Amino acid sequence: MILESVSKEPKGRESVAGRVKGLFNRGRNIQALALSFGLALSLGSNGVRADINTVPLVAPLYHGGDLLQKQLFKGLELSVTTGRDLAIFSVAGMSLDAYILTLPLDAPTKARVIARLSDPFYSIPLGHFLYLFYDRYSRAENRDQFRDYLLSQYSKEQIAPWQHSLFSLEEQVKDNTEPTVEANDRREGMTLNRQLVAMLVTVYDRLFNNDDWALGKKLPEHYRYLGDSPEDLALIADIQPLIINEIGKYVGSLPEGDMRSALELIIEDGKAENAAKVNNKAQAITVTLIDFVRLNVLKAYRQYALPAQRAKAFSAWMQASLKEDPKGLSDFLASWSQRPRAVQITVDGLSQGLMQALVAPNSGPYLKEVLARDAVLSQLSPASAMGRPQHTPKQDFLRQLVKNGVTDQYYLPFFKSLYRRSENGIATGGISSTPTISVRNLPIIKTGAAVSGKGGTGIPNFHFVDRTRDRAYYFFGNDALQLENLAESRGMRTMFDRLNYLKTLNCNAQYDWNAQTSFDALVNLGLGEAIRDFGEQRCLNELSLRAEAEKGLQHSVAAVREQLEAYDRMGAWRLFSRMSLRAKLNEQLNELALLSEQAMPDYLLIYNPWPDHFAHFKGPFSDEIIAPTGELNRLDYWLGRLDKVYRDAGIYPQTLWGMAGDHGLAPVYHTLNPELVLQDALKQRGVELKISKISSDEGEGPKITNNLNPPSLHGVDLVIASTAGGNYMLDFFNSDRGWQVQPLYQELTRFKVREGKALDMVSLFADELQESLDYLVVRQSDCTLDSCSVRLVGYRNGQRRDEMISRESGVIRYQALDAKGAPELLALAQSNPYLAPLSDVQLSAKQQLLELCLGSAKGCSAEQWRSLAAMSPRPDAVVQLAHLYDEDRAGTINLFPKEGFGYNTLVPGRHAGEHYLEKDAFIGFWGETVKPGQRLGPLDNGSLAPTLYQYLTGEQVEVGDNGWGYPSVLSSLN
């Protein structure tokens, strides 16, 4: 049996026809459209747009909005029936039925799947689901290409000193098994083997076996996650034994480690005697896998069907335009081929200060200060410390940089060129949102949405308690699949949502539902440790294929324009010649439309998690991160290859590039668990509290939560959760105004522990943790988007300091509450030891701001506070903490540890805190159109997406409108 399904293209590129509704208002005149867009353009920003004749930015039809967004691709409907009469579908180079026969399926399942392949409603989605998880992810060879590159540039003698736990000169293992790691190396990885694919096929078959859940004739606009309806519960009960059985098979292929241990606990919960257990992990993982399979079936089919629908719509419009206005069509194609493109790169843990220091080690004190503090902090023995990280970082390269510098042409060549050519486009200090944690900051960077308010992400931390649902979330585990659903429920719009009329590509980033082509974030995270360069290889392979198609497309556009000019010159009396040429042009336009969908994207989003991921386990300044064999040079290698693809494709001149990090990282020398300190303090007072810990310690394994039957928090006195070593969040429930209301400072000072007895919980934490605690932050008043007051409590020189930050009507005040002079917890008067000393002009400006903002009761604007804090060790601290509790789910008390301490961690790298090394995030823009007159100053990392959006669309971005939480800085780039 041969399934009729996909493509004539050998590289897996599909061509699919489909219905298109509401394509094009045929009465609309092309030249009128161009004129109207030109008028709109003249009313745009005065910055970049003012010099428009020098910027290949004007795509008057394709990007004017009216044509592409409102007419051409409006109303596209994606249906399964589209693909019923297609060519042969193949997976792994063989027909779908032949591939199914190779999988380790049980005999009844294999027979049933083979028999059902004749049903297109069953087989076509299955084929594209498998294409997503096999061909797309197996297209590249699983070799460490960065390693190969290094060995081609260095001799083994040159590279030998920079070997470390992530890089060895020994020959690589050729298969996909886990590499051997040291006992305290807590990295986790998984492999994409046939057993896993078989499990996914088995789940798919059971879901579709009775046609209870099928795609039908029209794909849904949004995925509906499983709930507690009778139908959903029956489906879960039917699938769960299958899932547990398949997990049992899969566990056998995993090495010993946290991943395997977690799966074995799930199998235990699958036993009949545990069926009624609260937070049953077998049911939890069943729900997660069903949602994962169904969600990715939909994604895979949407990504298969959409390009063909778009191509058909584009072809139909061009053929209609040919008939009505051939010259206008030619002008359109000329403009369209020069349309703007954008590349958005998000790198976990990328710090501007560190990168600038590495490309120019002698330009400032950064690296010397890191090494000097390491020498001091590593030798301290704090009385309150409970231990040290399990791994001691190897920092040989850091020492060489400080002692001798480096003149290695193969070390960070891309970043060196970037700082040399485009330094003004790189912010002097990128600002990470507090707490400086990825789950909070990544959606900010990717979408430009704020955390709170309409259109916000609604995700304040790596964990939170939703009091309205009586539900705790922790996103290292299966709750990660809930992130998109949670953000969407708050109205967050991704760049893919906003640009769904453009050609888009996602490489390894979450929040990708509307991406036209996507490489899954969770797959990359799961496989990228065991198979280095896994996601990067596949993304670059896809782009390389598209670059070749782009060059072919540009040749096709030129050829079609020549034919259009000939057609336009041809007299009306040459009727048959015109008809013949028009028929030929219609065929060429159809081919051009198909080719355009295979060419380079208008918008590309790339996410790279590895600099942060390994910095936690190895240390932020370890050889594993900063050496020539480390993660930052690996990142540099892939950025260089990406740059080359865009240059080879011929579209570099019209491409705006933007890159941001979500935070930096700081080293940990001493570890402490605040809940253990709390328990000892309560025991001494004869008090017991019911405490629920919802997070893993940094370096531990994931947690599984049953979304349909999570543990209730009613009756719990305190919920605790830690984040990345640098933030510790507590939720209390003792407000006089109800369980769902966040308690204020005064309520926490009289926390009832038993009849007639109360504790001052703020003082308890501040006093017991004073050696390790930088400060804690608690609500002084209720917080809204319009106003808030927070109290900071910490110790300095043995004295408790109580300080308050309040904001009202755009004015922020920061003051001491103990009448002991100016506030000092945020160290605004101090200089930043990692940066060059302030000039006389800067010192004068800082003194004026100190007097203005701290010397009077009037307060300052957010911009003034930002300018002041930029000249201190804690960038933007006042503004960030003033907005810490904009989101009600941001906890009751947040603890931030001192430099060198890590709360609830086993590893030597931390973030989520308030120190410069954690707050300093990279954000920068470059490209041939970027020519800022002066360097960008302190800038939120959330400005990345709005700037690229404005460049692509010409639309103004207004903070607070249309879901934007951060401003565009496009006008500052020219």
Model-derived features: positions:
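His/Asp/Glu-rich, glycine-adjacent segments
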Residues: D119-S123, G127-H128, L132-D135, E141, ...
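A long, amphipathic alpha-helix that forms part
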Residues: Y301, S315-W317, S321-S330, S337, ...
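Low-complexity, glycine/alanine/valine/leucine- and proline-rich hydrophobic stretches
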Residues: K898-R935
